Amino acid sequence: MTIPRLFLVAPDDKSVAHLMSCLTAACQAGDVASILVPASIAAGITAPAQALGLAVIVNGGPPGGADGVHVEAGTAAVSEARKAVGKGGFVGAYAGASRHFAMEAAEAGADYVALAQNGASVGGVPIVSWWSSVMEIPCVAFEPVELEGLDILLPQKPDFIRPSDAMWADAETASRIITELRQRLETK
């Protein structure tokens, strides 16, 4: 089984200094691939997060120096985002629990699709599992996952998972949560 990488989502109610403290601890503890940041803090966090080796994705805003943008799924939104980032950047699209929106986003040029994995299904098959079995574009299991949720989520084969938002409490909590996730992922 391929181990999914970690996709962090920064809250909009913390300072850049606080976020960077948690982010640095998280990167030291596990395989963090990327961080989705609110447009309001993108300018301050992009360069330091990229220095940690992360792809920085701006939620709904212009990419600036970030690696990409994240939009709500929909052909027009994805197409506009694709134009904004050009060929060098990437576009992610949140499709929630909608197979239709996810497929539209993929067809419009999204580089990844974020899905709401809890309870969402297609013909009784969990939506993340369905996506992973029929599509090549990477999938982010977008709802935060706790350790106990991994047993249900991992067989669905997401490419990326979002850790618990509790990780943003402080650097120690971030390190603990990411370490526990990494250890559990490595034993699966």
What are these regions (language model features)?
Residues 20-21, 122-129, 177:
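Charged helix-capping and loop-helix junction motifs
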Residues 118-119, 159, 166:
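Flexible glycine-rich beta->alpha loop in the catalytic core of nucleotide-sugar glycosyltransferases
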Residues 79, 129, 151:
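Active-site phosphate/pyrophosphate- and oxyanion-stabilizing loops and adjacent acidic/basic residues
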Residues 129-144, 161:
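Catalytic-face loop-and-helix region of soluble metabolic enzyme cores
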Residues 1-75, 83-98, 102-110, 136-137, ...:
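Conserved N-terminal beta1-alpha1 strand-loop-helix module at the mouth
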Residues 59, 94, 115-116, 142, ...:
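Generic beta-sheet signal
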Residues 86, 116, 123-135:
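Conserved catalytic cores of soluble enzyme domains
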